[in-house]
């Protein structure tokens, strides 16, 4: 298997149509619930192996992902890379932070892995946590890139298993809001 297709996402109920508030606060007519895609451990492992293969040349020593969406895929990427640790960040008082005793060693080479990238805001927050702790971010990976950019983190290496072009809007400019379509908040930041 190379990458992931929209048909695969649809088949497992992970591609949703409607009116959604994304974690970034923006609105969209489509939502990718990667947790449903990753609910099958074999599928999660395969996705982790694929993403790891695309990022192996970064020679990472650590994978860091934001909770909640990035935890499964980040763990699977770390496992596939072998001899690589996995940490996750969490929000505390609105700020992304390391907790649970996770400590980044100065100079460690870290990949940041996420489930879906739209604006890249959460990913950049994780990158800031890593660099503030003295680590070096050496690449970024995601299951889905819906940012509209080939590499939203250039010049760092970036890999995604699925790239889609789905418009997203500021709430004030959302045509779905104007039409009165009910808004659903399916993400981890509701």
Name each model feature, range by range.
Residues 1-190:
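PRPP-associated nucleotide enzymes
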């Amino acid at each position: 298997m190379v990458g992931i297709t929209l048909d695969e996402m649809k088949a497992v109920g992970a591609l949703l149509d409607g009116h959604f508030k994304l974690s970034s606060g923006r609105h969209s007519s489509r939502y990718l619930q990667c947790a449903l895609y990753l609910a099958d451990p074999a599928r999660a492992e395969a996705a982790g192996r694929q993403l790891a293969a695309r990022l192996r040349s970064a020679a990472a020593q650590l994978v860091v992902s934001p909770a909640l969406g990035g935890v499964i895929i980040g763990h699977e990427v770390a496992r596939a890379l072998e001899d690589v640790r996995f940490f996750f960040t969490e929000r505390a008082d609105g700020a992304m932070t390391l907790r649970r005793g996770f400590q980044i060693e100065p100079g460690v080479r870290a990949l940041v892995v996420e489930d879906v990238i739209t604006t890249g805001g959460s990913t950049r927050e994780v990158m800031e946590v890593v660099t503030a702790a003295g680590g070096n971010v050496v690449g970024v990976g995601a299951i889905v890139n819906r940012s509209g950019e080939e590499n939203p983190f250039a010049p760092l290496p970036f890999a995604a298993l699925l790239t889609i072009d789905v418009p997203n809007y500021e709430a004030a400019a959302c045509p779905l809001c104007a039409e009165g379509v009910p808004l659903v908040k399916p993400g981890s930041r509701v």
